[in-house]
Amino acid sequence: MTAQLNKVRRAIIDGCNPAMISDLLDDLREKNVLVDSEVEHIKESNNTNRDRCRAMIDSVKKKGDDPSNILLESLVKNHKTLAKSLGLHEPPMAPVPIQEHNADTIKNKDIKGVIPCSAEEFKKIQDTQGDKIYDVRKREGRKGLALIICNEKFENLNERHGAKVDLDGMTKLLNELGYQVHPHTNLTKTEMVKVMKEFAAQEEHADSDSTFIVLMSHGDRQGVCGTDSKKTEKEKGQYEVTNLLEIDEIFSTFNNVNCSKLRNKPKVIIIQACRGENKGGLLVRDDVASPPLEDDGLHFVQREADFICFCSSTPDTVSWRDPTKGSVFITHLIEKMNEYAHCQPLGDIFLEVQSLFKDKCPNSRSQMPTQERCTLTKKFYLFPGY
């Protein structure tokens, strides 16, 4: 459908008017093709109707066949005169309508994006779960933000080939879930801290109901590597990693004291990085070194609440990454989020991801994602597209 949209692109631009553009943008936003920030950018960054129409079409084209099809279908249904002049008399062959998607009738291999939550599913969950789930703001006023930091190239460590695949995949996933993504690449430890604090201070968090923080880099048991991290041998067989963003610092940045606008709202931390040397596979590792084993006791205080952290591996184990396809963890996470975000709480979706590793990697030393420091007090449903 991208080719068909490209074929009639010029004619649509020539025939557009302000009301038509407004209608189409509203429809694309309602059907989760464009997020609020994209719609506002199209409106505010273009001075003429033709420029707005051109920007809208080009934004949709970049997203692929299904979004292009939705735009053409909207044009046929709501602007019949123009559609007829373009030869678009029938709605193009479309995927299953957004409000009719059902995980039970769609095979996993056929899922190309997030399955939206239908009105029936939303009502059923609200009726049966009630006050057991986190509040969801109405879409019209919701401004969910997501932060992604993806380090690929380092001063002293190996390049993480395949990291761009993970970055693109997570950006697409979070956009489809309704979040405005703030992506950053190749940051030093100091830059990562600065970016996190700036993100935590965003005013839009006050109008959000949740946030995602995604960190993808090399790492070890204690944290995530910056591009300036370095591994040095202190004693024989014992290593120290410098310029490491520690896990505690991530949680501290977004706790109730330092990020009050996210108080009582789910804060999801996703970490794709190695945490040690134990291994059970043959791909590329996202590790630096394994420190001596220590007691890993965690102490929660009132200031740290409503977090859920999903790490790509258990402490002291490696995390595998394919140089061309991206990391195994991120690949499976996107797959299961696409499939179940419309009907299952996030914790259950994470269990689905873990089950894939259990089934495929029975060896206890193989990679196993783990949920850590979970202080959610309710179930967190994403309700994509609703």
From Swiss-Prot:
Its EC number is 3.4.22.36. It is found in: Cytoplasm; Cell membrane. GO terms for biological process: positive regulation of cytokine production; positive regulation of interleukin-1 beta production; protein autoprocessing; pyroptotic inflammatory response; regulation of apoptotic process; regulation of inflammatory response. The two subunits are derived from the precursor sequence by an autocatalytic mechanism. InterPro entries: CARD, Caspase-like_dom_sf, Caspase_cys_AS, Caspase_his_AS, DEATH-like_dom_sf, Pept_C14, Pept_C14_caspase, Pept_C14_p10. The active site is at 218, 274. Residues 22-88 form the CARD domain. Coiled coil: none annotated. GO terms for molecular function: cysteine-type endopeptidase activity. Pfam families: CARD, Peptidase_C14. PANTHER family: CASPASE RECRUITMENT DOMAIN-CONTAINING PROTEIN 18, CASPASE-1. Heterotetramer that consists of two anti-parallel arranged heterodimers, each one formed by a 20 kDa (Caspase-1 subunit p20) and a 10 kDa (Caspase-1 subunit p10) subunit. Belongs to the peptidase C14A family. Thiol protease involved in a variety of inflammatory processes by proteolytically cleaving other proteins, such as the precursors of the inflammatory cytokines interleukin-1 beta (IL1B) and interleukin 18 (IL18) as well as the pyroptosis inducer Gasdermin-D (GSDMD), into active mature peptides. This is Caspase-1-A. It comes from Xenopus laevis (African clawed frog). The gene is casp1-a.
